[in-house]
From Swiss-Prot:
Enzymatic reactions: glycerol + ATP = sn-glycerol 3-phosphate + ADP + H(+)
Native source species: Malacoplasma penetrans (strain HF-2) (Mycoplasma penetrans)
Pfam families: FGGY_C (PF02782), FGGY_N (PF00370)
Protein name: Glycerol kinase
Homology family: Belongs to the FGGY kinase family.
Chain sites annotated for binding glycerol: 85-86, 137, 250-251
Gene Ontology BP, a term: glycerol-3-phosphate metabolic process
CDD domains: FGGY_EcGK_like
Molecular functions (GO terms): ATP binding; glycerol kinase activity
Entry's EC annotation: 2.7.1.30
UniProt-annotated binding residues for sn-glycerol 3-phosphate: 15, 85-86, 137, 250
Positions contributing to ATP binding: 15-17, 272, 316, 418
Function, as annotated: Key enzyme in the regulation of glycerol uptake and metabolism. Catalyzes the phosphorylation of glycerol to yield sn-glycerol 3-phosphate.
Length: 507
């Protein structure tokens, strides 16, 4: 490997695994490493991660990817970090040890408290300041829960030893040996504590949730110098201090990675969940259709770019459920085969995968998963197909809400994430939503976005125009079903979703 050549390193800390991908000047993957980590479900509706395991897993992938690429620390121009959003960690700043497991974005334990806030009439205050709705999905009520329910957290707070942050903040703090306690605007905008108009932690909301400002990180742009990694984390002989220069939450990172840099451009990521974002430019559009307003990114001293976002909680994790829980598939790659098989004996089976409630545009944390339309002749392929179609139906719900908010039709949607590899899903999505689907050559655009942000700040790449040449479209999908068939399918889906509403409150 050329000893003088430079690379960008992207750390991608996801919901189920950590990855490191190393990119060259042409945006090509030089090497990668990925390792899954443990999911904990201590009670119904609770989801936790071990923050130390996330740290050691992420570090392990960094070292593995570096070793596979056969590069030295001085070959690394910069590091970008992207992460699962909303998931929070609270830790002792002296020992570096968490006071409790990380509470994951899927966790619903604060549902009752969120209902209380809504009954108190706080919904408008929260939405007008943060762009979000009151929901256990977001970080704020999770932080409050730890402060109220974990004695060690209260004790460390009293001793002024407590720090809090999302996963990006935790990794930055660990990589810099506790020198930097910071986050970026995109992650801050998902906490339900950050004012997206003033670009500051909102004191009124902090007081409402009883969260002291002192435990929260400094908020920086998505593309600037955060600090440098201790060389010991790269190798025993490493001496070069590699800068962290790009940070963004996974979905905003994906939007940037897809180069949706103009207002009106849309992307959908098919990962653990599904996340559809539309760039709205320098203007924050507040949704009338239960989408959330978020910061897409902020490049250095430039004004922030905003986005409308819809979130689906279960997408790829529904496929994982097919594989791991009910064991009807051996791996995700089999799904297209079974969908094709189901088409030979069609049935009207609908799967609503609301295992942890419904996200946008329903926001029903009491909904639970259900399968409708089962017959004596229903086979595994019909269940698989219904699960795949549910991903597209949920994404279509988001697109429909988005089109109402912006007042015009969306014609093109860029896609990425693991499940976008499914040609069956992409074709069905195109047909059901009446959009052209564009899938790039490299679908790892979340990691690519963090690389672009770090590379832009470090001068590795000089302009957006230069970036646009790096990841061409690999395949496009165009609508292929009649309007009559589409309307019938959508009617069945809407009926199925409706029947899952308010489930946990009614039994």
């Amino acid at each position: 490997m050329d000893n003088t050549k430079k690379y960008i390193v992207s750390l991608d800390s996801g919901t189920t695994s950590c990855r490191t991908i190393i990119f060259d000047q042409n945006g090509n993957m030089v090497s990668s490493a990925q390792t899954e980590f443990t999911q904990y479900f201590p009670q119904s509706g609770w989801v936790e991660h071990d923050a130390i395991e996330i740290w050691t897993t992420q570090l392990g992938t960094l070292q593995s990817a570096k070793s596979r690429a056969n590069i030295k620390s001085h070959n690394m121009a910069a590091i970008g970090i992207t992460n699962q959003r909303e998931t929070v960690v609270l830790w002792d700043k002296e020992t570096g040890l968490p006071v409790y497991n990380a509470i994951v974005w899927q966790d619903r334990r604060t549902s009752e408290y969120c209902d209380e806030l809504i009954k108190q009439g706080k919904a408008n205050i929260i939405s007008s300041k943060t762009g979000l709705i009151i929901n256990p999905y977001f970080s704020g009520t999770k932080i409050r829960w730890i402060l109220k329910n974990v004695p060690e957290a209260a004790q460390k707070l009293q001793e002024h030893k407590l720090l809090a942050g999302t996963i990006d903040t935790w990794l930055i703090w660990k990589l810099t040996d506790g020198k930097v306690h910071a986050t970026d605007v995109t992650n801050a905008s998902r906490t339900m504590l950050y004012n997206i108009n003033t670009l500051e932690w909102d004191q009124e909301i902090l007081d409402l949730l009883e969260i002291p400002r002192e435990i929260l990180p400094v908020v920086k742009s998505s593309s600037e110098l955060y600090g440098t990694i201790n060389p010991k984390y790269l190798s025993q002989r490493a001496t070069a201090a590699v800068p962290i220069m790009g940070v963004a939450g996974d979905q905003q990172s994906s939007l940037f990675g897809q180069l949706c840099t103009e207002p009106g451009m849309v992307k959908n990521t098919y990962g653990t969940g599904c996340f559809t974002l539309i760039n709205t430019g320098e203007r924050a559009i507040f949704s009338k259709n239960k989408l959330v307003t978020t910061i897409a990114w902020k490049l250095g001293n430039q004004k922030p770019i905003y986005a409308l976002e819809g979130s689906v909680f279960i997408a790829g994790s529904g496929i994982k459920w097919l594989r791991d829980s009910i064991k009807v598939i051996y791996n995700a790659q089999e799904c297209d085969f079974y969908c094709g098989l189901a088409d030979q004996e069609p049935q009207n089976v609908y799967m609503v995968p609301s295992f942890t409630g419904l996200g946008a545009p329903y926001w029903d944390s009491s909904s639970r998963g259900a399968i409708f339309g089962l017959e004596r002749g229903t086979k595994r392929e019909h269940i698989v197909k219904a699960t795949i179609e549910a991903i597209a139906f949920q994404s279509n719900d988001l697109l429909s809400a988005m089109q109402k908010d912006i007042g015009k039709k969306i014609n093109i949607m860029k896609v990425d994430g693991g499940a976008s590899n499914s040609n069956y899903l992409m074709q069905f999505q195109s047909s059901i939503s009446d959009v052209t689907i564009m899938r790039p050559t490299n679908i790892e655009t979340t990691a690519l976005g963090a690389a672009y942000l770090a590379g832009s700040a470090s001068g590795f790449w000089k302009s957006i125009d230069e970036l646009k040449k790096l990841n061409p479209i690999d395949k496009s999908f165009r609508p292929g079903l009649s309007k009559e068939v589409v309307n019938k399918k959508l009617k069945g889906w809407q009926e199925a979703v409706k029947r899952t509403f308010n489930w946990t409150n009614s039994i």
